Every structure is written in C-alpha cells, then in structure tokens.
Amino acid sequence: MSEILELEAKSRNEFGTGAARALRREGRVPAIIYGAKKTPVSISLEEKEITKYYRKPAFISQLINLTIEGTQYKVLPKAVELHPVTDIVRHVDFVFLEDKTQKMEVPVVYEGKERALGVKRGGYFNIVKRRVTLLCDVNNIPRNVTIDVTNMPIATSLKSSKVKLPEGCSFTTKKEFVLATIIGRRGAKTEAEGEQTAEAAK
C-alpha cells in the first residue's frame, strides 16, 4: 500500500464566491469531499501546505488521512483548481475512499523508454496514455503503474493485455487499448523489413 499523507482541515459553513475569497485572504483554500454514497463535507485547507503537496509527483493518486476537527477520513484527490498565473491551489475536490475497491486514475511510468530497443534502432517512443483508470483494492492503492519498455522493438505497440498491474488492481475496461507505440522514423526499418529486403537481394 502506498504511503499515506496526513493533512489537517477545518469544516466550513459559508459558501459562494465571497466566502471563497475571504478564505483565500486568510491563506486557506476551499475544498469538498464527496462520493461513496456519503454526505458531502465542505472543508478548508492551509494554502501553502496543500500547494506544496500538489506540486509533488503523483499527488492525484495520493492516499490521504484527512483530519477534520478530530474526525479522520480516508480520501483521494479528485480534481484541483489552480490560479491561472501563480499555479497556487485554489480549490480541491476529494472523494471518500470506498469500503472495498476504489476506481481511480494513476500515472503511467514508462521505464527505460529512452533506451528502448526500438528507439536505439531509430524509432520514436510515442506515449498514447499518460494516465490509466484502475479498479483497486483499497488496501493496495498504487501511486503509479510502472512498465519496463526496454525490450520494446520498433514499429510495435504496447497493449493493455500485456501490462502487469499491481496486485489487487485491474483496468476498468475489458476492451484492449494501446498505451504506447514505437514509431519508425523515415529511413528506419523494422527487423522484418530488413529481412525481406535481404531476401529480395539474393
């Protein structure tokens, strides 16, 4: 199970644009928790703290223990609104963690893409999916999906059926999809094309 982040929050009872501006003047950010068939909870967070954590890798798949005036909630970030100029967090949506399984988006890490076999032979590594949606056991929530693509040849695609997911996780769709491809650049030949050319020359 991924490391759990501990955050403190305060409940809030005032809503609307004016109330949000007043919170931000105090250095706080409005937020809400919803989902899992529970009553939504409106809260506020310390702006500097939540912005600091947002800027760390894979925040959107970070499991969080959110303490609100003595009561703890296990939540996941769902959506983050940023200031258009400063990139400071302005609003956060969280979802309550489900009882058994959790649907969530996680980033995909393509390990070894710069030195992949197909790239060494002149190909270009093309990322189709930077994030994937998974259904995960709540006791084993991953921060990301890491795929070793070192041996991926040129002119091939990486399909979901070939990806080994973390234990307790599955894709939310059974339909096969492509996560990445290695595209041959002009002048680059696949191994099969090279063999055909050599055969024709005999």
UniProtKB/Swiss-Prot annotation:
GO terms for cellular component: cytosolic large ribosomal subunit. The keyword Phosphoprotein does not apply. InterPro entries: Rbsml_bL25/Gln-tRNA_synth_N, Ribosomal_bL25/Gln-tRNA_synth, Ribosomal_bL25_b-dom, Ribosomal_bL25_C, Ribosomal_bL25_long, Ribosomal_bL25_short, Ribosomal_L25_dom, Ribosomal_uL5_bac-type. Keywords: Ribonucleoprotein, Ribosomal protein, RNA-binding, rRNA-binding. One of its GO terms (molecular function) is 5S rRNA binding. This is one of the proteins that binds to the 5S RNA in the ribosome where it forms part of the central protuberance. Part of the 50S ribosomal subunit; part of the 5S rRNA/L5/L18/L25 subcomplex. Contacts the 5S rRNA. Binds to the 5S rRNA independently of L5 and L18. Belongs to the bacterial ribosomal protein bL25 family. CTC subfamily. This is Large ribosomal subunit protein bL25. It comes from Rickettsia bellii (strain OSU 85-389). The gene is rplY.
